[in-house]
């Protein structure tokens, strides 16, 4: 496809992409030909420049940072410094998704190639931009595997935060060389010595190695790349060996299909080659190879040490599994797959239903398209008595679910109802069988309850950084959420690092929102899996006139059943209208009522036309009305609109 913008021939200074609006006249055939020739010359010049750079001059690095510490802004400054983009181009070049820009988070791993000349020789740098949130930890670890080091970014005004700590330990465990960067030194609230001291005490990195910068203004950013070249080792790769490539990430392009981001560990890869997956043993024809500069730029070939893209002609995006190894077809004998492959494992499950049931078919297509771009989401159809046809979705975490819902609404304009999140519970039966349940409907009913030997629920180790003055509030919050304290560490500048083991089910129920609330927004949170523990869990059903509302059924700890039941019945009562008969709203556990609310019958004055003295007729009409209401209560059915479920399930209520 011919690009309608000119790529400059000077490689060290890259002009911004020109925006073409409908008012611009179309190019003539001669202009298109000249542009095509110019692009081809530029592409060849880039390829020749890469081929001249020895692998000893490659540097692959990432940026480790807490959310909102300036990772995307620093990336922009580095791209400007190396001439990949010009100053003034759109901010957050590496954040491709709209939701990434709006939330200020990175969801998909991205990369960009940069050239740097220190006056003596050329260097090829690959910046691998990774998600920072624990929900996307699988993508983070695969991205780190393609790097030799990382920039450890710390906000000078906020200091070390939870996500920084968690990602530091992940990077450190993978042997990455870390360069500490103190960012936002231009702020009035910046405490540079305090941030440096935190880096030294928390991570045992020499504070003298810290580089103090302002990514916003560009102050001192020019010191970073020389430090990368000096401290981060070149990739340990060999171009002469048979091809081995690690899949770092992938996405679906509507025009070319699946695009895969690969770290070429050994060998060389070019258009027309056949490659094979180590995991599935499926073969693919490579349609295109290239580098991200910052967008896709086709090359003749890519080689060992590079982090680059290929278009493999893959039909099903779910075949692209992060961490998979690819070989050249017919030349894989005796080769070992690269370490680190693991299937995405959903840990949070929700029921999803269209707000308007008539839109199911259209929304099903939209849902399938979105899942194409996110292989970590599991999708299967399910039916609810209350909400009709829908889907059961599995996500890596609550943020992952929230991002998916937001993308569905923004990219397709869909209105969707999500049920309360459920985590995977393990059930061990007395006959030796084991079952993992992700839906409250799968929970054993009363007839099978005595067959169960034990229930297990997943736990996580939560890492929180909070101001010392709010430590008591946070400890109370953790205790109320069945948390168990594991460690407490006093950082400098009045910050405390808390480690708690907390049930995952408690964490996905807006724990982070409550944490922010009790610390006035100053706390940060990260977590990692801590295995399964025995637990006394039960199924809490919400019934309206004896009819269970499956969309509102949830699994909780027995100690919380009564309090949660009272909360549910009083909350749902607000969204039901009065009927001509009395309506009972009950919360049940093991068929026993633990909480109840009653909606009084709508009263009609059947005696308004009677004479005051007609007592017998008065009593007769009231008795008849009473009998009618009794019969209606026994046989009548309460019609509940989807709006009521949607309002009940909305978290901000």
Swiss-Prot record:
Disulfide linkages recorded for this protein, renumbered to the chain, are none
Cellular component terms (Gene Ontology): mitochondrial inner membrane; mitochondrial matrix
Keyword Repeat tagged: no
Q: What class of enzyme is it?
A: hydrolase
Q: Please list the residue ranges annotated as the tr-type G domain.
A: 56-236
Q: How does it sit in the membrane?
A: Peripheral membrane protein
> What molecular function terms (GO) are annotated for this protein?
GTP binding; GTPase activity; mitochondrial ribosome binding
What Pfam families does this protein's entry cite? Answer: EFG_C (PF00679), GTP_EFTU (PF00009), GTP_EFTU_D2 (PF03144), LepA_C (PF06421)
User: Where, per UniProt, does this protein localize?
Assistant: Mitochondrion inner membrane
Write down the CDD domains for this protein, in alphabetical order. EF4_II, EF4_III, LepA, lepA_C
Q: Which PROSITE patterns match?
A: G_TR_1, G_TR_2
Q: What is its EC number?
A: 3.6.5.-
Keywords assigned by UniProt?
A: GTP-binding, Hydrolase, Membrane, Mitochondrion, Mitochondrion inner membrane, Nucleotide-binding, Protein biosynthesis
Which GO annotations describe the biological process of this protein? Answer: positive regulation of translation; translation
Q: Which residues are listed for GTP binding in this entry? A: 65-72, 129-133, 183-186
NCBIfam families in UniProt: lepA, small_GTP
Similarity comment text for this entry: Belongs to the TRAFAC class translation factor GTPase superfamily. Classic translation factor GTPase family. LepA subfamily.
Additional comment: This protein may be expected to contain an N-terminal transit peptide but none has been predicted.
* Protein name stated in the entry: Translation factor GUF1, mitochondrial
- This protein's gene is called GUF1
């Amino acid at each position: 496809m011919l690009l309608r913008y000119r790529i400059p021939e000077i490689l060290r200074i890259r002009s911004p992409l020109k925006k073409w609006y409908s008012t611009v006249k179309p190019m003539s055939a001669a202009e298109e030909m000249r542009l095509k020739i110019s692009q081809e010359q530029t592409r060849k010049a880039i390829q020749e420049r890469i081929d001249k750079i020895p692998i000893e001059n490659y540097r692959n690095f990432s940026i480790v940072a807490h959310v909102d510490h300036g990772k995307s802004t620093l990336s922009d400054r580095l791209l400007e410094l190396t001439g990949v983009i010009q100053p003034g181009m759109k901010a957050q070049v590496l954040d491709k998704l709209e939701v990434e820009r709006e939330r200020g988070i990175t969801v998909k791993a991205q990369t960009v190639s940069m050239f740097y000349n220190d006056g003596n020789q050329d260097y090829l740098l690959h910046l691998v931009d990774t998600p920072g949130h624990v929900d996307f930890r699988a993508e983070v670890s695969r991205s780190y595997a393609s790097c030799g080091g990382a920039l450890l970014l710390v906000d000078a005004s906020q200091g070390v935060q939870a996500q920084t700590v968690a990602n530091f330990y992940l990077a450190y465990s993978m042997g990455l060389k870390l360069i500490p960067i103190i960012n936002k030194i231009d702020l009035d609230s910046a405490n540079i010595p305090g941030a440096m001291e935190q880096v030294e005490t928390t991570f045992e990195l020499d504070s003298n190695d810290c580089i103090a910068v302002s990514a916003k203004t560009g102050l001192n950013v020019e010191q970073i790349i020389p430090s990368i070249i000096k401290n981060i080792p070149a990739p340990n790769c060999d171009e002469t060996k048979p091809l081995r490539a690690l899949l770092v990430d992938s996405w679906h392009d509507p025009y070319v299909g699946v695009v895969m981001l690969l770290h070429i560990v050994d060998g060389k890869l070019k258009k027309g080659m056949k490659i094979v997956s180590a995991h599935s043993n499926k073969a693919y024809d490579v349609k295109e190879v290239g580098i991200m500069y910052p967008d896709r730029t086709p090359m003749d070939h890519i080689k060992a040490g590079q982090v680059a893209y290929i278009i493999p002609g893959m039909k099903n995006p779910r075949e692209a599994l992060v961490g998979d190894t690819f070989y050249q077809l017919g030349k894989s004998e005796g080769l070992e797959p690269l370490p680190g492959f693991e299937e995405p494992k959903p840990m949070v499950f929700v029921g999803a239903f269209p707000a308007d049931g008539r839109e199911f078919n259209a929304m099903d297509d939209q849902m399938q398209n979105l899942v194409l771009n996110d292989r970590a989401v599991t999708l299967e159809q399910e039916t609810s008595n209350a909400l009709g046809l829908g889907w059961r979705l599995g996500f890596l975490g609550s943020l992952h679910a929230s991002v998916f819902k937001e993308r569905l609404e923004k990219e397709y304009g869909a209105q969707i109802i999500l049920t309360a999140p459920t985590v995977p519970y393990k059930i061990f039966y007395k006959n030796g069988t084991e079952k993992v349940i992700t839906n409250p409907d799968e929970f054993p009913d009363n007839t099978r309850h005595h067959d169960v030997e034990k229930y297990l629920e997943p736990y996580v180790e939560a890492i929180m950084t909070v101001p010392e003055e709010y430590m008591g509030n946070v400890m109370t919050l953790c205790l109320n959420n069945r948390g168990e304290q594991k460690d407490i560490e006093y950082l400098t500048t009045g910050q405390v690092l808390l480690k708690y083991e907390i049930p995952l089910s408690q964490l996905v129920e807006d724990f982070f929102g409550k944490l922010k609330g009790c610390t006035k927004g100053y706390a940060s949170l990260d977590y990692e899996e801590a295995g399964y523990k025995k637990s006394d869990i039960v199924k809490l059903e919400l019934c309206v006139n004896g009819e269970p509302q499956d969309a509102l059924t949830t699994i909780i700890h027995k100690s919380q059943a009564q309090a949660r039941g009272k909360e549910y019945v009083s909350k749902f009562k607000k969204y039901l209208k009065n009927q001509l008969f009395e309506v009972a709203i009950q919360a049940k556990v093991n068929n026993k009522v633990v909480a109840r609310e009653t909606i009084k019958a709508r009263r009609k004055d059947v005696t308004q036309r009677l004479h005051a003295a007609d007592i017998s007729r008065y009593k007769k009409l009231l008795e008849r009305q009473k009998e009618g209401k009794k019969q209606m209560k026994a046989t009548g059915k309460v019609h509940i609109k989807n709006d009521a479920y949607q309002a009940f399930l909305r978290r901000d209520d």
